[in-house]
């Protein structure tokens, strides 16, 4: 009788993990549905239009007819357990699709035969390569009218390399596909399959010198003997298989299941993920082995937060065996939790299981401490273990929000925190300069969905608007100001007189206050009141309502009254003297200038640089970063970047990406200043 450890090892080798990635409308969800149905996991294929697919179970997904979340499913075929992750295809939802790559051996990039290679397909191929995953391309919707599949295959090879070779070819006459790896003979829409068979075998044997010699001697090698070199070719990116399917008609779906089971890597054959031990510069690579007998290491690649069910962590087991009785630590946490209930997911349904081995994708519920990207482990010494970080796009599209009902600020923060826990590309920040709570996401659609979730899931209403620009005010010349405050109301009066001087300071120097009063013209106890009045203007602005910065204020003379002088009188005099001085010191409004980096296709560089110039930006340089991509660097006013991602998408067919970081402040053009000061005067008059 085999030992338990041998049984678990065999179970682990009978696992495949696959993420369906690529552009929206490529048919990823429909393909997942077809695979589930063909494997007998569901009785009939659901429909996206009817909102009945397993993967798109969120009410918002059903309403929008698009995937918005990564959805985990499982099925069995030929004795092998297949974990399948369907991912959204929109660039606004990379926070959902990219983490799925951390949980699988193979990234399957799905391409719509009718629309060809789209930017998201290119992007996901790049991300998968950067994580050293086996990659395959699935051409879906092959029964679309007027499509040249031969031309599309040529486009795929031109875009991704000659290592993209078909494992099967379409046979339109019989509405099926023909295997060309195990099968040497037969015909397809591309002609005889023998040429495709030879190309595959030659590509595989190239990674093993012994097989190369044998192939040259015998003219062919039985594909059944090529499993080890095939897996090596997949690991090294030397082979990127291409499969043709139609999720609508079912053509190629059964063959795709066979490919997944027979040819794609199991957890022992794929490239192991890059785990690190330690933090920062001290971090060093750590060996993790897909061995069910070792201590547990698992990685949380998705978190969901339900207002009724609580927090659920979905994770991939990389090492060791989990059971319901396992005690797991979360990251650097000191207190373990008991698993209790372990689930496999089938869309929104949870199927309880007794254990999980390397390769399994499972979930635990009602664990409040769990968080995205956490490493779960059962050995205290494995604290400070983490996965090498993913290069997420930086969320730069902002939206200021505030509760519709006054007094709900704390609840707003709590709910927004729950949404951010589910989405690594959603950032929440309180911007002190404008006193706003700002949501930062990957685009307009991303943030619109966040607001929809607030309303529909949490029944919480917010007011949303573009974030205010953090303008500043300063002066460019030295000037003097004077004000006498005198108020007599019949009883005790108020009196204070202040003479002061203001001087510009270098950018970033802040505020300086000096007392040069001599002879007791203003008694020392009233100087802080003068400064208080000045600081009121600093905070509220003098010409446009924005904070005043980089000025030096010197109080040098004044008058007081032995009875009527009070703090309030000198605060008022100081404030109004400061305002008078600013008006004479050539005041200007400063605007934030950001450093921008834009990655775009070569053919879009001219459009992007021209557009940047039209936004009052300055291009500082361009550099070739490879793969037909150019990085454009420059500086541009923050105010000119409203809805920039939408414009960039239009100029680059969705392939453009940008990041920004605050660089410096500089004076706005006269026309802009006139508009800002005019708006402020109008506001003050209301």
What are the residue ranges of the model-derived segments?
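Structural and coupling elements of P-loop NTPases
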Residues: 1-686
């Amino acid at each position: 009788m085999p030992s338990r450890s041998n049984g678990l090892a065999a179970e682990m080798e009978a696992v495949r993990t696959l993420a369906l990635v690529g552009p929206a409308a490529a048919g990823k969800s429909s393909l997942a549905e077809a695979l589930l149905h063909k494997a007998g996991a569901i009785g009939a294929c659901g429909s996206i239009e009817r909102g009945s697919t397993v993967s798109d179970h969120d009410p918002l997904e059903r309403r929008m007819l698009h995937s918005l979340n990564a959805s985990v499913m499982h099925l069995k075929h030929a004795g092998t357990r297949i974990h399948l992750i369907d991912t959204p295809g929109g660039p606004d939802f990379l926070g959902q699709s990219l983490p799925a790559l951390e949980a699988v051996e193979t990234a399957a990039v799905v391409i719509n035969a009718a629309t060809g290679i789209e930017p998201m397909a290119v992007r996901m191929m790049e991300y998968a390569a950067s994580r050293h995953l086996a990659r395959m391309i699935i051409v879906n919707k092959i029964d679309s009218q007027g499509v040249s599949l031969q031309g599309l295959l040529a486009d795929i090879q031109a875009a991704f390399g000659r290592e993209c070779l078909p494992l099967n070819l379409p046979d339109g006459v019989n509405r099926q596909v023909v295997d060309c790896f195990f099968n040497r003979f037969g015909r397809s829409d591309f002609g005889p399959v023998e040429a495709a068979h030879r190309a595959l075998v030659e590509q595989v044997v190239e990674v093993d010198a012994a097989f190369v010699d044998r192939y040259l001697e015998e003219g062919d090698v039985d594909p059944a003997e090529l499993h080890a070199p095939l897996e090596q070719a997949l690991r090294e990116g030397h082979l990127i298989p291409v499969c043709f399917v139609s999720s609508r008609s079912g053509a190629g779906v059964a063959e795709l299941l066979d490919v997944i089971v027979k040819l794609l890597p199991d957890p022992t054959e794929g490239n192991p993920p890059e785990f690190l031990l330690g933090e920062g510069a001290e971090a060093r690579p750590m060996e993790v082995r897909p061995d069910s007998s070792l201590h547990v290491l698992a990685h949380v690649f998705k978190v969901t937060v339900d207002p009724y069910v609580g927090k659920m962590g979905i994770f991939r087991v990389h090492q060791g065996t989990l059971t319901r009785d396992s005690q797991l630590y979360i990251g650097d946490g000191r207190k373990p939790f008991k698993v209790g209930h372990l689930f496999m997911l089938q869309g929104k349904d949870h199927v309880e299981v007794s254990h999980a081995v390397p390769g399994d994708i499972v979930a635990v519920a009602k664990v409040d401490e769990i968080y995205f990207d956490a490493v779960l482990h059962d050995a205290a010494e494995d604290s400070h273990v983490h996965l090498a970080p993913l290069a997420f796009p930086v969320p730069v599209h902002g939206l200021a929000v505030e509760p519709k009902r006054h007094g709900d600020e704390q609840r707003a923060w709590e709910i927004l925190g729950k949404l951010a826990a589910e989405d690594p590309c959603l950032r929440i920040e309180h911007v002190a300069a404008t006193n706003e709570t700002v949501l930062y996401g990957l685009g307009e659609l991303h943030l619109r969905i966040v607001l929809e979730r607030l309303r529909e899931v949490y029944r919480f209403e917010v007011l949303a608007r573009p974030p205010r620009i953090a303008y500043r005010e300063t002066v460019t010349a030295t000037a003097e100001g004077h004000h006498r405050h005198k108020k007599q109301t019949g009883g005790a009066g108020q009196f204070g007189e202040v003479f002061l001087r203001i001087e510009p300071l270098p950018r970033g120097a802040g505020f300086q206050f000096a007392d040069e009063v001599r002879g007791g013209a203003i008694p020392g106890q009233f100087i802080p009141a003068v400064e208080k009045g000045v600081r009121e203007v600093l905070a509220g602005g003098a010409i446009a309502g924005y904070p005043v910065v980089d000025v030096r204020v010197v109080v040098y003379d004044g008058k007081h009254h032995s009875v009527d002088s009070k703090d309030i009188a000198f605060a008022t005099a100081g404030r109004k003297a400061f305002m008078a001085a600013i008006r004479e010191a050539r005041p200007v409004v400063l605007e934030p200038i950001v450093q921008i980096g834009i990655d775009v296709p070569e053919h879009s560089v001219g459009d992007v640089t021209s557009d940047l110039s039209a936004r009052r930006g300055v291009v500082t340089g361009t550099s070739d970063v490879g793969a037909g991509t150019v990085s454009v660097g420059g500086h541009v006013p923050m105010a000119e970047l409203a809805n920039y991602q939408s414009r960039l998408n239009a100029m680059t067919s969705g392939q453009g990406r940008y990041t920004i970081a605050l660089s410096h402040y500089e004076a706005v053009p006269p026309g802009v200043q006139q508009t800002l000061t005019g708006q402020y005067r109008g506001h003050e008059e209301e």
